[in-house]
């Protein structure tokens, strides 16, 4: 069975963090460059606030764990998310050049990670900036590239890697989905063993972590 799905699921935010790390630019300056290159939308909120990655990890975790996971349940602890009716993820808008310098001094980089994991105590999912060092396979995933790491109890770790932002990668993904839907009308991606019952996630305070 699959116990964990995690990774860098948004090419826009990864491009921004990569440029802040390699070139020392501030968030706003790199965001403008990303928009000029077509990597970021004119309204980038869905990307930079983590909403896009949140929806993606909800889908991937649902498929991996065999139960429906509501993206609105992922890492919710602020009243603002309730008022806006949006998932309360931690995006990258508050990441500063100083944060990047501290990460470098610790031999790490900052990545916006989406994580879905199930344990003996229950399942949880979250999207937030994380400091990772070179021992992590996602450390060297830079620019507009995405990577998804899957951990299975039999296969161990496997990683899938590719471009996640830009006109051609986006168009390719959309067209592939349309073609798949047209070739297989009336079917879904949910296979045997799927349970539409909503999977309740562990509260934030029970999620293990370290600083």
Predicted features by range, described:
Residues 173, 178-211:
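A conserved regulatory-domain signal marking ACT and ACT-like small-molecule sensing domains
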Residues 122-124, 145-147, 155, 208-211:
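Active-site lining segments that contact anionic ligands and/or coordinate catalytic metals
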Residues 20, 30-140, 145:
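Substrate-binding/catalytic subdomain of NAD(P)-dependent oxidoreductase enzymes
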Residues 1-18:
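A contiguous active-site-proximal alpha/beta segment in oxidoreductase catalytic domains
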Residues 156-158, 162-168:
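Glycine-rich phosphate/pyrophosphate-binding beta-alpha loops
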Residues 4, 16, 111-112, 126, ...:
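Structured core elements
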Residues 17-21, 162, 172:
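Short acidic, glycine/serine/threonine-rich loops at helix termini
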């Amino acid at each position: 069975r699959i116990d964990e799905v995690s990774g860098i699921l948004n090419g826009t935010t990864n491009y921004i963090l990569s440029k802040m790390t390699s070139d020392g630019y501030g968030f706003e300056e790199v965001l403008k460059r990303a928009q000029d290159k077509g990597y970021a939308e004119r309204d980038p909120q869905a990307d930079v606030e983590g909403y896009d990655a949140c929806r993606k990890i909800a889908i991937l975790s649902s498929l991996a764990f065999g139960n429906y996971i509501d993206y609105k349940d992922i890492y919710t602890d602020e009243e603002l998310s309730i008022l806006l009716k949006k998932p309360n993820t931690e995006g990258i808008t508050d990441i500063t050049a100083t944060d990047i310098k501290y990460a470098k001094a610790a031999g790490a980089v900052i990545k916006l990670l989406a994580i879905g994991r199930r344990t003996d105590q229950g399942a949880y999912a979250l999207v937030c900036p994380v400091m990772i060092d070179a021992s992590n396979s996602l450390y060297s995933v830079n620019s507009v590239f995405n990577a998804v790491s899957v951990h299975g109890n039999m296969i161990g770790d496997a990683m899938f890697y590719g471009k996640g932002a830009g006109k051609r990668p986006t168009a390719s993904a959309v067209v592939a989905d349309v073609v798949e839907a047209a070739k297989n009308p009336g079917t879904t991606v949910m296979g045997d063993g799927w349970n539409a019952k909503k999977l309740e996630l562990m509260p934030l305070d029970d999620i293990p972590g370290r600083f």
